[in-house]
Amino acid sequence: MKFVDEVSIRVKAGDGGNGCMSFRREKFIENGGPNGGDGGDGGSIFMVADVNLNTLVDYRYTRHFDAERGSNGGSADCTGRKGEELVLRVPVGTTIIDATTQEIIGDLTKDGQRLMVAQGGWHGLGNTRFKSSTNRAPRQTTPGKPGDQRDLKLELKVLADVGLLGLPNAGKSTFIRSVSAAKPKVADYPFTTLVPNLGVVSVDRWKSFVVADIPGLIEGASDGAGLGIRFLKHLARTRLLLHLVDMAPLDESSAPDAAEVIVNELEKFSPSLAERDRWLVLNKCDQILEEEQEARKQEIVDRLEWTGPVYVISAIAKEGTEQLTRDIMRYLEERSQRIAEEPGYAEELAELDQRIEDEARAQLQALDDQRALRRSGVKSVHDIGDDDWDEEDVDDEDGPEIIYVRD
């Protein structure tokens, strides 16, 4: 199975049918007059959000989509048949962008939401339309108008309430397995997670929220290193970020240093995303002695100058996870209530969301431009001395392509 979250396609709506020039011919009736019908409208192209889809792989290899042309008009005032509409189904959370103008055409965030991306051409007029008291036999018709043609860029951002941040092997996948029914791959090597994973966390009856796990970040991720930078955009629509830190790294590296790396990369990618509400979650507390936990915790808090909520958990042992999920549910409910009661707060969050979207798109566009320079054999000024790339990057035209191999 291949996960694709960015594609470029071209859509062409159907042209309108031409008007018909025809005259009535009947026995014993001279100069029967015009009876040419109008053409049919061209078919339009729509995109519909489908909750059953979770990737844009269907548009990875088929990139040109044409709607049906309207039929020409006929004699006896027959109107041409309209072109059939073309419906393209995409996952919920897909943003449609005009590749030429970079204008955001629409954002499909609800199942069944429908958006027209290309308008079919208007029908041509038959010669009957031009009949008048002074022109009884018009020979004038009009052709159908051409349908819209657009180059589109589709971007998929998963919809989740909570996003997980952390270095590889910080325990993000273990956490999501611990609190939900999702079963992402877990192993003792970096970059086990290659694509975003979603898990639904049920707290009480009729109360639940969605958690998104993305590939781990590494130092230099904001400059294109590793996998996580391209998937950070999936956290743009979350309401809360959980920063997971490994309290007992296997390589005996510094936990405070690891925590600081994530904060720095997040701020470089999008300063506005760094303003999103974020909780610090110290994982793998079962790997260190109980009397050392407080000292390790304080060391990380002091390094980050942290003033927000801090949780010490063990995802694999499910220690502290229940309290954390209940606090998250309470936070989300209070946040929703505040949005409903305080219009100013809602506007503030909407402005923050827009800034995050703009910064994320600008950052990813810069990385795409950089990769295009490499593909053409030219290095940018910022890339001088940077050899951290391989031929696989050259072949990847639409961002990351991840292949799942089942054992």
Curated annotation (Swiss-Prot):
The chain positions of domain OBG-type G read 160-333
Stated EC number for the protein is 3.6.5.-
Which cofactor does the UniProt annotation name?
Answer: Mg(2+)
Q: Taking the first listed entry, what is the main subcellular location of this protein, grouped into a coarse class?
A: cytoplasm
Q: Quick one: which residues bind GTP?
A: 166-173, 191-195, 213-216, 283-286, 314-316
Top-level taxon of origin: Bacteria
Query: What cellular-component terms does GO give this entry?
Result: cytoplasm
Q: Which Gene3D superfamilies match?
A: GTP1/OBG domain, P-loop containing nucleotide triphosphate hydrolases
User: Where does this protein have compositionally biased stretches of type Acidic residues?
Assistant: 385-400
- EC category name: hydrolase
A molecular function GO annotation:
GTPase activity
Write down the SUPFAM superfamilies for this protein, in alphabetical order.
Obg GTP-binding protein N-terminal domain (SSF82051), P-loop containing nucleoside triphosphate hydrolases (SSF52540)
Question: Which sequence ranges form a coiled-coil region, renumbered to this chain?
Answer: none
Location of this chain's protein in the cell? Cytoplasm
What does this gene product do? An essential GTPase which binds GTP, GDP and possibly (p)ppGpp with moderate affinity, with high nucleotide exchange rates and a fairly low GTP hydrolysis rate. Plays a role in control of the cell cycle, stress response, ribosome biogenesis and in those bacteria that undergo differentiation, in morphogenesis control.
Q: Name the chain's protein.
A: GTPase Obg
Annotated organism of origin? Pseudomonas savastanoi pv. phaseolicola (strain 1448A / Race 6)
- Gene symbol? obg
